[in-house]
């Protein structure tokens, strides 16, 4: 009996000691990196910047040459007035409910969720007036000084809390390539842009976050912008547009669809397809704290902004997009 008591005492000490050690480790983790002391909360004060302190961006990376495709196509898909939200990620975690661990907002296909298939997307209703059944989605933006009260505002968990800000506008746009004509995207091509784990990854190779203010279109930042009164907060998410010609998806979700290199030239072995660009705008009162939904360990870093799409246009719809881009016209659908 004495030995059993001594063993029980030892176990209790180990458990308590382990808990203390865990607390020390967690405290050390929360005090490291560029967001000291924030643990898994965030964002940090340094995640915000006055847009006036952001230098103007350089001009376009490359002017469209004589062999390029200078057109543009705007697809009218509304601004998620249907309140299509979920915690799924069809591109990254197909078949896994709540696999995103944060909330996504959608335009386009109204049936899109983790369980969607090519066939279900092809049959789904859409918010796009021209009949595009593609799904376009991104993590929601929240006001953290106001509690979320609706079910879709409280379902994500994992530290994602606050009132979801509705998009004041959503622009779905396709652009061409500055040095080449584009070829059609294949049906059900999956694509993603940005790095949802940018805070912990450290390296910035996949970071594509572009935050800004509507009154300063020449300034963009990877931090949350403080905008002048009357301006909208903007997010611009440009997707890779060089397809390997074979696959609609890939392990890691990037190798089949890559970004152009310098001057807009696609990497060897890839072909230029229409470049998708999403531009989101929000009404944010001056000084209101905002945070993009994220994995808990990413601390709502603005650098983690990202978006995904699945192309469900018909071959005819995509052909019209390609023709508009390659002939240098500005079209709407």
Q: Which sequence ranges carry the predicted segments?
A:
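Secretory targeting and sorting signals
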Residues: 2-32
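Primary mode marks residue(s) on the alpha4-beta5-alpha5 output face of response regulator receiver
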Residues: 33-101, 105-237, 244-333
């Amino acid at each position: 009996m004495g030995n059993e008591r001594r063993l029980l005492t030892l176990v209790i000490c180990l458990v308590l000691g382990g808990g203390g050690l865990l607390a020390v480790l967690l405290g050390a983790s929360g005090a490291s990196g560029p967001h000291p002391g924030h643990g898994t909360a965030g964002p940090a004060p340094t995640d915000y910047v006055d847009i006036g302190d952001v230098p103007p961006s350089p001009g376009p990376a490359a002017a469209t040459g004589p062999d390029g495709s200078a057109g543009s196509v705007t697809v009218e898909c509304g601004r998620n007035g249907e309140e299509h939200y979920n915690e799924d990620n069809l591109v990254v975690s197909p078949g896994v409910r709540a696999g995103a661990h944060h909330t996504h907002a959608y335009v386009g296909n109204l049936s899109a969720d983790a369980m969607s298939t090519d066939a279900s997307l092809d049959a789904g209703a859409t918010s796009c007036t021209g009949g595009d059944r593609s799904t376009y989605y991104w993590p929601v933006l929240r006001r953290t000084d106001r509690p979320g009260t609706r079910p879709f505002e409280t379902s994500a968990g994992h530290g994602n809390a606050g009132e979801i800000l509705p998009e004041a506008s959503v622009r779905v746009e396709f652009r061409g390539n500055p040095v080449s004509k584009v070829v059609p995207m294949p049906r059900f091509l999956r694509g993603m842009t940005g790095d949802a784990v940018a805070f912990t990854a450290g390296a910035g190779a996949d970071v594509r976050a572009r935050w800004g203010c509507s009154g300063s279109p020449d300034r963009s930042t990877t931090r949350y912008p403080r905008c002048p009164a009357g301006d909208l907060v903007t997010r611009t998410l440009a997707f890779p547009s060089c397809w390997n010609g074979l696959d609609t998806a890939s392990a890691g979700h990037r190798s089949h669809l890559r970004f152009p290199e310098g001057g807009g030239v696609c990497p060897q072995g890839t072909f230029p397809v229409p470049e998708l660009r999403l531009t989101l705008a929000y009404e944010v009162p001056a000084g209101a704290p905002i945070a993009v939904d994220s994995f808990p360990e990413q601390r709502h870093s603005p650098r983690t902004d990202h978006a995904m799409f699945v192309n469900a246009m018909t071959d005819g719809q995509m052909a019209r997009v390609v023709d508009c881009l390659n002939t240098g016209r500005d079209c709407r659908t």
